[in-house]
């Protein structure tokens, strides 16, 4: 593409992504996992977050043992320098901004190496991917920053493989691809599977610079350096390597056939839709998606094997198919159960393969006609579900986990941040309450994480000077039901606290149950 086409398609693609994902951003409620990276951000406005915050020398380094507080830090800068008040709109916009920026950078980096038709096809495939749209808007994985980094990675790969420039000027690109993979692993350890794409990249670009791999390894080491430091620190304290602390041999109960189907049909967004909206598209769409994508990838492989000596684009398309297949093999090897927010790491490698193959098949008219027909079918078939998803975004349709009542809970928490204490008796409400209070210290507790939740809540309430206590129950996690009941029983039987009717505004909170306790006269 020429410079004008590159700028134009980059801007249009980024704008389209925003338009498709930013409709009524507060219509769905805030989900617990969606906000798990937010508490650490309040460190930057003077709070002392404990939830999902693993500090190193006082600075939040990790949100989980396997994920870095990068998004937390960026949003923390927003709170400190732009607007000190948390909102679900600004939080969701940050994830959208990540992907929009990544998409823009992809076209700017790879634009000179792409045909216009390839760029358009790549954009259409990515922007019609329901999983991409839903997980970008509702970044519970998290997935948004990781997708942005992969877009940059693929852009650099295309530039390295197809750009005619050789020599030392390319070495910074090798260093940068290594850095991007390193940052991806730092952002979430499950992205370690990107070592496979990095290896394939180095193989496909080895003629560009024989020492390029050294620069890539250097970039990789630099990107993962904070993670290495964190693990050395925990090991030195006798706690072992923190990133391996949640490794398990449990791989879940998903069968091989079901996994392959879910992997190939991810573009229809069946699993994200079920989680966010509580609905699932007709199975026909999923099977058609899987069949169409498989057919396209087979055509690419067949063409690449026949034309590997003559077409660099076809060879590269074949490399992207190999990457997509390698990632499918890699995910089950992760020592932890995986789900759609892990599998989406394979996107958009498959789209890069399809986009590259389109102009490269020009010499094989029959194969090209079939390829174009299937690609058009794949995109058109997504349109009905794309329309449904956009309508769901706008209308506020939601599952119990994303019920709009969670946004109401956040607003109610904000009004009680000075005079009340909140207890989340089970999983699913604490991050929302904490963010609603704008990072109020010692404001919300989760006793269910402890073996004796009843004693934990007695200890918490005996140390507070607040006179009002709200107990929030979501019922989402059945495994916490007994702990939740024990917490409520401990307060009901307490001589210090007595049950009281909740205020009218707390009474209508959908699937969320809220109980109020006030300090008794005897407790005074």
Regions found by a protein language model. Give the residues of each.
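Extracytosolic helix-loop segments that constitute the early lumenal/periplasmic catalytic or substrate-binding loops
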Residues: 19-20, 35-80, 236
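Transmembrane-lumen/periplasm boundary regions of multi-pass, lipid-linked membrane glycan transferases
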Residues: 40-43, 47, 183, 195-300, ...
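Loop-to-helix entry region of an early transmembrane alpha helix in multi-pass inner-membrane enzymes
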Residues: 69-73, 81-101, 139, 283-291, ...
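Membrane-interface helix-loop-helix junctions at transmembrane boundaries of multi-pass membrane enzymes
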Residues: 2-5, 111-118, 165-171, 205-216, ...
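Membrane-proximal, lumen/periplasm-facing interface regions of secretory-pathway glyco-
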Residues: 340, 368-418, 426-444, 448-451, ...
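Short acidic/glycine- and proline-prone juxtamembrane loop motifs at membrane-interface regions
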Residues: 31, 135-143
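Transmembrane-helix motifs of polytopic, lipid-linked glycan transferases
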Residues: 10, 89, 93-114, 152, ...
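Hydrophobic/aromatic-rich transmembrane helices and adjacent perimembrane loops
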Residues: 38, 96, 136, 193, ...
């Amino acid at each position: 593409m020429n410079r004008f086409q590159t700028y134009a398609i980059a801007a249009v693609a980024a704008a389209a992504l925003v338009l498709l994902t930013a409709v009524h951003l507060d219509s769905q409620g805030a989900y617990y996992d969606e906000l798990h990276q937010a508490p650490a951000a309040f460190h930057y406005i003077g709070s002392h977050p404990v939830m999902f915050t693993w500090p190193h020398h006082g600075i939040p380094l990790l949100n989980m043992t396997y994920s870095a507080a990068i998004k937390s830090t960026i949003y923390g800068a927003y709170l400190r320098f732009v607007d000190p008040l948390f909102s679900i709109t600004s939080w969701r916009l940050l994830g959208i901004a990540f992907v929009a920026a990544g998409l823009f950078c992809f076209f700017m980096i790879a634009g000179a190496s792409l045909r216009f038709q390839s760029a358009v096809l790549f954009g259409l495939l990515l922007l019609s991917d329901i999983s991409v749209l839903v997980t970008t808007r509702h970044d519970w994985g998290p997935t948004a920053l990781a997708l942005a980094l992969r877009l940059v990675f693929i852009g650099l790969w295309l530039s390295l493989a197809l750009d005619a420039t050789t020599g030392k000027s390319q070495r910074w690109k090798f260093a940068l691809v290594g850095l991007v993979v390193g940052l991806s692993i730092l952002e979430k350890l499950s992205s370690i599977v990107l070592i496979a794409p990095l290896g394939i990249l180095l193989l496909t670009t080895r003629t560009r610079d024989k020492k390029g791999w050294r620069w890539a390894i250097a970039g990789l080491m630099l990107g993962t350096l904070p993670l290495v430091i964190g693990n050395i620190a925990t090991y030195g304290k006798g706690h072992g390597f923190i990133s391996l602390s949640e490794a398990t041999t449990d791989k879940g109960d998903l069968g091989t056939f079901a996994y392959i189907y879910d992997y190939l049909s991810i573009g229809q967004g069946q699993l994200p839709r079920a989680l966010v909206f509580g609905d699932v598209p007709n199975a026909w769409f999923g099977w058609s998606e899987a069949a169409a994508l498989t057919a396209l990838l087979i055509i690419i492989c067949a063409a690449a094997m026949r034309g590997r000596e003559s077409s660099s684009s076809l060879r590269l398309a074949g490399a992207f198919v190999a990457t997509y297949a390698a990632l499918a093999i890699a995910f089950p090897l992760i020592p932890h159960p995986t789900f759609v927010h892990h599998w989406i790491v394979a996107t958009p490698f498959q789209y890069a393969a399809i986009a590259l193959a389109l102009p490269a098949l020009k010499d094989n008219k029959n194969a090209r006609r079939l390829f174009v027909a299937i690609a058009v079918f794949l995109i058109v078939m997504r349109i009905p579900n794309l329309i449904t998803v956009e309508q769901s975004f706008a209308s506020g349709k939601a599952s119990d986990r994303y019920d709009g009542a969670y946004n109401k809970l956040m607003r109610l928490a904000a009004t009680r941040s000075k005079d009340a204490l909140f207890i989340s008796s089970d999983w699913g409400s604490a991050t929302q309450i904490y963010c609603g209070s704008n990072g109020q210290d010692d404001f919300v507790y989760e006793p269910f994480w402890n073996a004796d939740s009843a004693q934990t809540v007695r200890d918490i309430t005996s140390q507070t000077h607040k006179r009002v206590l709200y107990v929030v129950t979501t019922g989402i996690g059945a495994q916490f039901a007994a702990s939740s009941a024990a917490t409520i029983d401990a307060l009901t039987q307490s001589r210090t606290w007595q049950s009281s009717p909740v205020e009218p505004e707390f009474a209508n909170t959908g699937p969320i149950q809220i109980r109020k306790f006030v300090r008794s006269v005897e407790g005074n």
